[in-house]
C-alpha cells in the first residue's frame, strides 16, 4: 500500500479541507514502509491526524478502531489505495455543516488501472430523482423499485452518533465486511440525502485487491458468510 498512500493522505490534508476534518489513520500491521509515511504526515499535521498502529486484524478491526476514537459529526471511510476529489470534498464538508440526516450518500468514480497506468474510469451515478432532497428510508425502498439507484460502502457517511449509539462493530479477522457496514447501520437510519458529488475515487486493477476475481475465488466462504 505504501506507493498509494501519499495520494490518499494528500487528499485529506489539503489546506482547503483540513480545518474541518478529523483524520484517523489506522496502520493494520503493515510490513512495508506505510507506517513511516503515516508518521511523516502526522509530524506535519499533528493537529489533524490521529494514528492508530496495531497488529493485523483485517478490515473490520480497522473500522472498529477508527470509530472507537472518532469525534466528528459524520464517519466516512477511505481506503489507503483510494482518494477523495478535493473540490468535491470542499463542497461536501460545506454541506455537512447544515446537514442533519442520519446518512449522507455521495457518488463514486471507478479508476481502472493496468499495473500503474490508468486506462479508463467509470462514473457511478444515482438517479437524479434522489439528489439534494431529504428522504425517509421507507420512501427509498419504494422509489428504488422504479428508479436506478446504486450506492455502496464508499458512498456512505453515517452520523457518528448513530453508529456509537447502536454499539456498531464489524466482524474482525475476515474480509468483505463492507456488506455489513452497508446494511446493519442502515436499519437504524431514519432519513438520508444524496449529494451529486463525485467524491470517492476507487482504484481498480491492483493485484490482490479484494474485488479481484482470484481473491474472490480464494475467499469464497468469507463472501458466503457475509451474505
Model-derived regions, located:
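Acidic helix N-cap motif at the loop->helix transition within catalytic regions
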Residues: 3-6, 32-41, 53, 87
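Glycine-rich, basic loop-to-helix element that forms the pyrophosphate-binding segment
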Residues: 54-70
Amino acid at each position: 500500500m505504501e506507493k498509494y498512500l501519499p495520494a490518499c493522505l494528500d487528499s485529506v490534508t489539503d489546506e482547503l479541507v483540513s480545518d474541518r476534518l478529523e483524520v484517523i489513520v489506522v496502520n493494520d500491521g503493515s510490513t512495508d514502509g506505510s507506517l513511516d509515511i503515516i508518521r511523516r504526515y502526522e509530524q506535519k499535521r499533528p493537529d489533524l491526524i490521529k494514528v492508530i498502529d496495531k497488529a493485523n486484524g483485517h478490515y473490520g478491526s480497522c473500522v472498529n478502531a477508527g470509530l472507537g476514537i472518532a469525534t466528528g459529526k459524520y464517519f466516512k471511510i477511505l481506503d489507503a489505495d483510494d482518494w477523495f476529489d478535493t473540490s468535491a470534498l470542499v463542497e461536501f464538508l460545506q454541506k455537512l455543516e447544515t446537514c442533519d440526516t442520519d446518512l449522507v450518500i455521495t457518488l463514486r468514480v471507478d479508476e481502472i488501472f493496468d499495473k500503474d497506468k490508468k486506462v479508463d474510469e467509470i462514473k457511478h451515478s444515482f438517479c437524479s430523482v434522489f439528489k439534494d432532497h431529504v428522504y425517509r428510508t421507507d420512501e427509498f425502498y419504494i422509489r428504488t423499485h422504479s428508479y436506478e439507484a446504486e450506492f455502496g460502502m464508499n458512498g456512505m457517511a453515517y452520523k457518528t452518533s448513530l453508529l456509537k449509539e447502536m454499539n456498531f462493530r464489524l466482524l474482525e479477522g475476515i474480509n468483505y465486511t463492507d456488506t455489513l457496514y452497508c446494511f446493519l447501520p442502515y436499519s437504524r437510519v431514519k432519513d438520508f440525502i444524496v449529494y451529486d458529488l463525485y467524491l470517492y475515487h476507487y482504484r481498480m486493477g491492483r493485484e490482490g485487491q479484494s474485488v479481484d476475481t482470484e481473491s474472490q475465488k480464494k475467499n469464497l466462504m468469507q463472501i458466503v458468510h457475509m451474505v
